[in-house]
Amino acid sequence: MDQSKRLLKSAVPNPPEHFKTGISWLDDLDEKDDDSATSVNYDIPEITEANLCNDSHEALSPCTQPVGNSGRPVEAFKTYPSTPAVPSKSVLFHFYEPDENFSLSDTGRTKSDTALAARESSEKSEVPRDTRSAGIKPYKENNSSNCAISKEAGLRRLIDKDRESFDKNLNQSFTNLTFPEPISDDSDSVEFQRDSLNNNWPASLEGSIHELPRNSDDDGIPASAAHILDLDYHRDSYDSPWKKFLPYPSILSDDSWKAPESWGTSLPTEAIPKQVFTTRFFARPSLGNRKKEFFLRVYRDDRTSVSFICPIGIQTHEVIKLLARLFFLPSSANFYLLLIQFNTERILLPHEQPCIIFERLLSLFGCKVTSDEEINEEDNYSVARLVFTTMDIGADVLRKFSEKKITANLDISRSNLEVIPVKIYPYAHELISLNVSHNLSLDLPLDFMERCVKLKRLDISNNLRSPRGKPITALRQLEVLNMSRNDIYELDPLIFSGLSRNSLKELNIANNKLFFLPHSTRYLVNLTYLDLSYNNFVTFPLIITELSQLETLNFSHNLLSQISSKIGSLVKLKHLYLQFNDLSNRLPQEIGLLKNLETIDLSYNAITNIASLSECPKLNSINVACNLLSFYEYSNPSATFIDFSFCPLTTIDPAFSYSNLVYFDISHAKLIGLKDSVIETLVNVETVKVNYNHFTSISDAISAMQNLKYLSCTNCEMSYVSPNLGKLKHLVHLDLHANNIKIFPEEVWQVSSLKVVNLSSNILEKIKLPVATSKKLTRTISQLKIMRTLSGNPVSSLSSQEFVMPTVEELYLVDNRLGNDCFTALEYFKCLKVLNLSYNYLTEIPSKFFQNFSDLKHLFVSGNELANLSISSTAQVLLETLYANGNRLSSFPKNEALSKSLRFLDISTNNLQNLAVEKAEKKSLTKLPQLEYLNLSGNTWFRFSEHEDTNFTKSYLKNLKFLSIMDLNTKFSNAPSDVLNHFIQRNSPQPNILRYGVCGYLSRSIPVISACELVVNNFLHPQSSLYCVLDSDISAGKNNRVLKFVYDNLASCLAHEINAADSSSEQICNALRRGFLRLNKKLGNVIHYDLRKSSEGDVDSNYVTTMNISEKGYSMDSSCLDIGVSIILVYVRDTRAFVANVGTSMAIMSTRNDSEPTTLSVMHDVYNRDEIRRIVDSCGFISGEIKSTTTRAIGRLSQFPGVQAVPYVNVQYLSELNEFIILANQEFWSVLSKRTVIDVVRANRHSPLLASTKLRDYAIAYGAEKNVLVVIVELNGLFEENSLNFNQLRGDEKTLAISEKNDNMSFVQDLPDDSSLARMNREVSPPKGCIAMVFTDIKNSTLLWERHPIAMRSAIKTHNTIMRRQLRATGGYEVKTEGDAFMVCFQTVPAALLWCFSVQLQLLSADWPNEIVESVQGRLVLGSKNEVLYRGLSVRIGVNYGVTVSELDPITRRMDYYGPVVNRTSRVVSVADGGQIAVSAEVVSVLNQLDSETMSSEKTNVNEMEVRALKQIGYIIHNLGEFKLKGLDTTEMISLVYPVQLQGRLERLIKSRSLGTPTALPETQTYTPVRSRSNSLRPMLARLSDSKSVHGEEGGSGKRSVSSLRNVSPSESTGGYEGCIFDDQQYQLLYELCERLEDHAAILHGFPEPPPCDTGLAAPVNQAEEYSLFYRLTLRIENTIYCVSQMLGHTG
């Protein structure tokens, strides 16, 4: 019989004294709290009925009692099981959309879970009231006996029965409700009105009862009704048509009571949809294409998983239902779906779409959403995972709180909270600081916040959800509010309109997505600190200008284009941060009204004028680095910190002094010097950096800087240092490397405080010391000047007792011109701890030299001509570091003290035969007990003794961490490298056509392996190689397990993806990207595995199999989540180089006849604007234990999605012109410029190992402190037909290098007085005979000198550097210069034109001063395709060819040229305009004959390379006609030659001359550039021959001819195509073969390049497509052959 449920009153108003809930951990918590005198006992409701729940089916919390508006708690109630009643059609259990602020109850379960547990327990027949402590029983034990109706059909049949009986019984049940007495500590509560609940109380709950419309459809079943009738309440609950009806008047209603927000409930009127402030993907993702299928994988608590395909728009409750059926569960009501990312987790709301959320996370990880393979692959455990669970989320948290003492400063961050724990409530009124950050599902309830009456600091950052304003407004004393990194698009206006608006002082809303601020921001009248960094502000919010008390404003990393003129109203502003915006032009004048401004940061903008800052009297810190300032003529007398670095400054002339300045940085500017008047005002400055300027000298006025401690003036072309530098008594660090200093004043050595001096890469020949008086008193500076003038005696001839002992501890003299006499002066440096004399001209070290240095710990003498180290066996030498590579050592010094103290030893590239460190060679290696770094590479005669174990690193050198044995002709153990313990650097045992060199530096301060290389020859293919540099951000004392993992698994992950792709360039690039992502996922799985294993012990095999990891453990801990690895790799395959990188490692490539390298990678750091915007858009962050600026890396998983592993990938098509590729880590590139790197490698191109070692040594000399690693890959071996020629050239270069060292003194005399040019290739001998003469001139130079004299001084230096560097690279001879004009000559016309083309192209990209670029003569001019045509100085060039008369100039000692050819060349250049290259008829004739047989027979190897390089660039010849040149009797035919990249200049010229001129224009010849690919077809033919042979169709008798397919008529195939002639890879090979044929013809015969085609080629899907494809390929080949035949004169 039908009967309604009975709701009876509780017999006892309060629970018994020893009441038990049946939940073990909760009962234990209550027992521990009994002894606490301050705790508040909350009543536990006896039974919570299932229908008494909110609109989200979240039951009332069993740990708190509902408190009405009157302040009294509501009594608990209980139900007894009975036959369920059937609702009538006039009644609707209305179900609202779930609240987005989904939360858990205080027990950790959802409220619906508690209600379900109570209902299941109550359905047992005749259960006594006090047996509730027995716990929750499984539903399946009594589901068959207690459920009256279990199917929808039954519900529809019974829905019309006993409607009136149901209403009557139900109303009677609610009438009998009573409630216990209140237990509340709320002082503001009022007397509770009991009569207000009569017959109306259930209406206050969001599962309230409403009338059902008569015409309603019966197909949709109300969720509340389904819940009461024991049906699955998830069915159609969120897509049901019932939702569209508005609330009807409830049967029972009471407006006097409202449930607290900590219950997660709300009134029905509040359930009406309204404006929502939530995050992008934690609110309601768009449905998208619901029909699209998505592969979803869900885990269970036991770590097993299930995978299935579902629609991408499926909602959470639907997934739960599906999982319940898959796991054969009777009900899904007690289950949740957790989204877990590392240590954070969140319960997905019923209406959310897990697939869309998961797809979004995968896209942030780097997967392509359009690729089903990447999105649907199973191995996504490390990105995020979904867990189907019933476990109590809050249980572990509350257990911790039971053991933790709650203080006034409470930190519950990273606790995965759903609600505020109950234990905190009694202490709420005592809290002063509350940190609830990193809790993704936590929403602060209003009732709890109302209790926090003393709260002053609230941190709700990193919760990835927009906070509601109402709870925050209840905080009356809130002073500090942190809402950073919450993915906020728009702030709730209520946040700033409540009680806290008057007390709030600090507000942090950084790292969100805000475009504007709400109008209520103006109410924050006492706000002093506002952080709006890392947002999307485009305009300056005017509301901020109304915050009159503001002292600190951070607007960095936004998109501001200008600053409001009303900013002057912020009269109390002290700190203003505006870096990394889009500010341009001048600052508003109103900034000068900020009289209290102390700090301003405007770096990384485009500001041109900061004159308004001079009006700020208290401004002490100014940072305008990386702007467009060209002059600064203002003053800030109170300034103590000024940073003008990376600004094109040409003038600094302040109106007032900088007497308070302490830090001054003007590096990377365009300054030619500082005025003495400016220097004299810097009386208190302590740090000065003027690197990368055009300083020629250090002025005598520097003596005014009496407090100077640090001076850095590097890469300035400086040749003179003032002796007054010796007057700086507080100078500690002096860095003058990479200049042209020939004489260093001896007065500097008498500065007693001087500790570090770096004079590397200068042209020093001697070291002079100051001379002391007989009374051992230092002479004055003036006396030293007189002595230096009157006496010409060298230092060695004076008495040793007259010299001052310098106090320098670190002395760097690398890359100078010092001889053996330098040791005489160095003997007086008794305090030396570091001495670096590498790359000088030393042949012998005095035998007694080491006896005087008791403190010397680190000695570097690499790159000299030392035959021995002259260390006696009895000398007490306690060196820790000894670098003696690149010498002629045949034996190691046998010194017992030395062998015991050595930690870092590099004796590579010598003539060593063994490593005997004592007289008895037996077990000699045991005498190196402290050795950590050993480099033996390049000792081709080295042999291990017979008694030495091949595995000696474990037997003898137990502390050894790094061993390099490259190019050793000896057998060695094949034990693999262990990055954690012993890393072995060796050549690959597999043969390879590419030579490479590797060298590394193990930091003395942090001797931990943080960088290593990975080289795999014959990687996947015989003609393929893989070269990688791995660099990690490891701190001291930590073993880099992440680096070891990447080293072990990188190659396998790449191989897995490349094998699955075809050979097209696009597919390989995509495979490299997928390989990086695969490696990062695998790393995450391993870290999870090791963390779980360390916390739980052994992990079952199912878990290992599920995450697809090997059983090899790396013992990773939680710190590994903050460690990342930067990778730069080059994958050379046939004649293509695929480059991929993440992080800050970088690669460059050198090309013959080009002085500038090509950058192959992208730096992923916080200085990259694109990376900053990506981080802001993904709501990521860059922080953590490892303070790194890297934005992409393998690892650093704790900072996802701010840090991702998506690489930058590109492909370079190689040719014979490409010389080498250089890969190195960040520390290497931070101290060495690209130009220096290219110059050093080119000078040592005969040996990549020697070049890499020299680069390592230069990095040490220039200031590298961390680990350094560099890899050089030589590319010449790719082209077999020219390998002999290249080997011969390398042999000649090596012979030349050896002869130069043998006759080093004469070689030194021939070097120029420019250290940068001296590093490059030696200047060619003066050309003779028929030569190409070139004249250059700068257009409008006189006018520019008149208008911008200071800027022109800097511009001329830039111009001269480009000219001279390109001359060395191309092989030209500089005859002389006259003003700004150059006269140079070349042996061949192609070399001359190569130089002209390169110069014109480099002038466009040069770093000119702003005054030049903004002038009319040097302004930017763009072409029709938006390409740069003119920018900066415009240079005209004239070229002529013929026989000249040469004679050596006795004054300059350079060859000079005379004769008619020279005169005609000077006239030809006058015909050209700025940016034009005018050539004579002789030059055009030579160009036309380049392909003739006569010219080909006369070509040399070098000439052939020049011709190929010229045709690769491409050029255009435009005939101007005949000209009568000044001083010449006959007319001259003049033509213009342009590189193809500057074709727009010719178009502009033709267009300007054709206006108003109908006459025909002269003829133009075009030589289009060919693609930069191999001219050799051998690699392609080899690849094609290695593929499987062509087969015929199934059932065919034989192979088909490709050419025969032309005459076959294509026909459409109706059925599926079962097979092709070739597979995908072979089709791609054929496609590339056609391209190589066309390139080959174009290079040899100058034929124009064919139209560009698709990058990839897949196999045809039917026979018609196959025939069409072969027809196109065959036609292209025949067209190429026909064109070549026509050009060669063949017909027929």
UniProtKB/Swiss-Prot annotation:
Residues 120-132, 1585-1597 have a biased composition (Basic and acidic residues). GO terms for biological process: adenylate cyclase-activating glucose-activated G protein-coupled receptor signaling pathway; cAMP biosynthetic process; intracellular signal transduction; negative regulation of induction of conjugation with cellular fusion; negative regulation of transcription by RNA polymerase II. Activated by binding G protein gpa2. Activated by git1. In contrast to yeast cyclase, S.pombe cyclase is not likely to be regulated by RAS proteins. One of its GO terms (cellular component) is cytoplasm. Its EC number is 4.6.1.1. Mn(2+) binds at residues 1337, 1380. Residues 995-1275 form the PPM-type phosphatase domain. Residues 292-380 form the Ras-associating domain. It catalyses: ATP = 3',5'-cyclic AMP + diphosphate. It is found in: Cytoplasm. It comes from the Eukaryota. Residues 1-22, 103-142, 1585-1614 are annotated as: Disordered. InterPro entries: A/G_cyclase, Adenylate_cyclase_G-a-bd, Leu-rich_rpt, Leu-rich_rpt_typical-subtyp, LRR_dom_sf, LRR_domain-containing, Nucleotide_cyclase, PPM-type-like_dom_sf. Residues 1600-1614 have a biased composition (Polar residues). GO terms for molecular function: adenylate cyclase activity; ATP binding; magnesium ion binding; manganese ion binding. Residues 174-195 are annotated as: Required for interaction with gpa2. Signal peptide: none annotated. CDD domains: CHD, PP2Cc, RA_CYR1_like. It holds the Pfam family RA_3. Optimum pH is around 6. Mg(2+) binds at residues 1337, 1380. Acts in glucose-induced cAMP signaling by catalyzing the synthesis of the second messenger, cAMP to activate PKA signaling and repress sexual development and gluconeogenesis. Interacts (via N-terminus) with gpa2; the interaction is direct and serves to activate adenylate cyclase and cAMP-PKA signaling, to repress sexual development and gluconeogenesis. Interacts with git1. This is Adenylate cyclase. It comes from Schizosaccharomyces pombe (strain 972 / ATCC 24843).
